[in-house]
Amino acid sequence: MDYSLLPKDYDIFRCNQFYFEDHYFLGKKIKKVFFNCSVIFEQYYTFMQLIKNNEYEYADIILSSFLNLGDSELKKIQRLEKLLPQIDLGHNYLKKLRAFDAHLQYHELYENKRITSGVYMCVVATAMGYKDLYLTGIDFYQEKGNPYAFHHQKENIIKLLPSFSQKKSQNDIHSMEYDLNALYFLQKHYGVNIYCISPESPLCNYFPLSPLNNPITFIPEEKKNYTQDILIPPESVYKKIGIYSKPRIYQNLVFRLIWDILRLPNDIKKALKAKKMRLRK
């Protein structure tokens, strides 16, 4: 990243596991922090520990939510709204951009496509009125080697999101083409300027480098004794809230298959017992 390409005053937006990085590449002060729905409960717990440890400062936390999800996800979001009212719901920002929101709804419904977290931040920034967006870290999964600026294969995050055990944890619902189209849409319909501030990034193949050349001397501070993995709350906390009552291992396909096989004899026994009772009647 070339810091001279940044303006003198700017707001920082970060998302997901950014706190894994071993340096404060963009400083400790963050304007908006974005977390995905699937691990928001754990991310919120983790981030509050980061604040407690003076690892970061922030203004707002935003849930990267969509209104066109299934009923189970919508119920989860509604539940979170009551449990964690201090978190802003991202889809409230999306609704301010009616044309873009319709674009998202259509492609999720009919083509099973969704923007990535980095692009989601750009959408929220546009809805907030920002006109100049300076981007780094959005590489459309084109980077060779580790696609992250940090080691992402950590024990707890893999427990919660098994796909992180892979070198590149790309979901089929995401694609470079769809992300690019979303960014172009923001440019065309809302007049935002999108600049790249990492000259070696694949992003520069599609958007120009920032025209700025500020004499900024910024040396990222190296972290010491910092949080390097997502934190999982005590089991007692999960028991307090019904929606998360089962540990996430129950959501693992292999575990559920083995569990169902182990339960099969007992289920057959119950079914035969019920059949005998019906025959007696």
What is each stretch, according to the model?
Residues M1-K281:
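Metal-ion/cofactor- or nucleotide/acyl-coenzyme-handling active-site neighborhoods
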